[in-house]
Amino acid sequence: MTHPLVEPIRSLHRRIRADVVAACERAALESLSNVASDEEGDTIYAIDRVAEHVLIEEIARTIATDSAPVVLVAEGVPGGRVIVPGGADASRAAWTIIVDPIDGTRGLMYQKRPGWILTGVARHQPLQREGSEQARQAVLSDIELAVQTEIPLVKQHLCDELWAVRGHGASATRVNRLTGDSTPLLLRPSSSATIAHGFAMISRFFPGIRAELAAIDDEIVEEILGPPQQGKAQLFEDQYISSGGQLYELMAGHDRFVADLRPLFERRRGADGPALCCHPYDLCTELIARELGVMVTDEHGRPLDAPLDVTSDVTWAGYANAHIRQLIEPLLQQALTRRGLLA
């Protein structure tokens, strides 16, 4: 089964990818890493603006019409949510489209790691008449189409494109951006029943709570693998500052477990907690991972249900398979409970 928005969104992603790579080729690292603004959802860097300029223009040109507008949720747009085309009647919208134009900005702008374009599509949930209750807001689990496209480093000529329609599996291709040729790509999550000698980690990207996150990580690993052995590495970690990139590593079989627990600490500490957490747009392509067999949950082991906005904080865990989940999830929840982090 296909979806009417698969090809328009893939085309949108290709244009964003081309424009961002071209900007990276032209610009100095310092200019791309300048702070453009501080939005509700995240800090916006100069490189982000390159993608945002394309986003509304392409959606207006290829997807949205006055008779069938689109509700666009994205970083960088006014209020994090706009109607495309502007001035259209939102009650007539068929789709809510949530986009992260560049996920992994920090690694990409310094040319350390590829970034990703992330898009999720859900049926629009219209608001009811004034004075009545609002219809339920669309959440991550309502997404029925997800598209994820790699933004390569300047020195990299191959890049991957992934997409999935809910209940109908996932597809992927590897594209040569120099020739335009593409070949089918088989993504297969790890089937290993252990984390030993594999990649498994808890995200701790930024200062503030890294010691506590590392302590949880070490507790889980020691419970599973025993105390560290002198001169031997029991397992490895990769702090990829991109939620889409982390999902890709699970899909590709490179990683066996990833968890981002930052919102739990913010909830516990209130205003004194870390200001930067994962948001719904960072995880709007988790459908692709689930269609490939990756198990993606919240801190309680439930499906992700954050609203499609740019401000909600999202705690998530990804397990390559059911064996890994059975191995880690109880220990993770015990560690969180001991610290009073599970509500």
Whereabouts are the PLM-identified features?
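An extended, acidic
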Residues: 6-9, 13-16, 20-24, 28, ...
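Short regulatory "switch" loops immediately downstream of catalytic or recognition motifs
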Residues: 47, 57-64, 73-83, 120-130, ...
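Conserved S/T- and glycine-rich ATP-binding loop of Class I adenylate-forming
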Residues: 104-105, 289
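Active-site-adjacent structural elements in enzyme catalytic cores
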Residues: 37, 73, 82-100, 106-167
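N-terminal subdomain of lithium-sensitive/metallo-dependent phosphomonoesterases centered on the IMPase/IPPase/PAP
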Residues: 1-102, 322-323, 329-333, 337-343
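Short, conserved micro-motifs enriched in small and acidic residues
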Residues: 42-50, 108-111, 241-244, 276-283
